[in-house]
Amino acid sequence: LRRYEAAKETALRQLDELYEKARKEAGEDSAAVFDVYAMILEGAQFDASIRSAIESQNVNAEYAVAVAGDDLAKMFEAMDDEYFRARSADIRDLSERLISILQGDSVKSAPGVGAVILAAKDLTPSETVQMDKSRLLGFITEFGSSNSHTAILARTMNVPALMGIPVDEHLEGRIAIID
């Protein structure tokens, strides 16, 4: 339980830092996603689910976070409204952040290869804000929608982005255009 509590505090500090970075680069409205993340992290349902699993089921913190995050994300995915369905990606991003902290992983960045158009299966709002905008010409993701927080951040940061486009792994290192 102590590991989870320490990871939660670390995550809250990271979310504050991401909020400030996003506020400077994309404005107050776009940065608010990280306030929402903090509210979820501090919210009774998510926190209680994790604590209960650790205490009553005797599982490790990583497993408890993964299950609680997955359960909450599935609840959002089942909603009729597309906006709320898109929030499931935010829950998964937050859960992955907590698990990474618990496992001692650090934030990864792309190697210094010059200007790029990034093609990925999916990008989280956290990953989007942490990108080096001086090298990023745009990005394409296979998953996501125009309602996702990633798309909203991309628009407000003036980063060209296409979402819902199949990504071919054989395109690495090739010349590309986003139109």
Predicted regions mapped to residue ranges:
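Non-catalytic, soluble scaffold/interaction modules
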Residues: 1-179
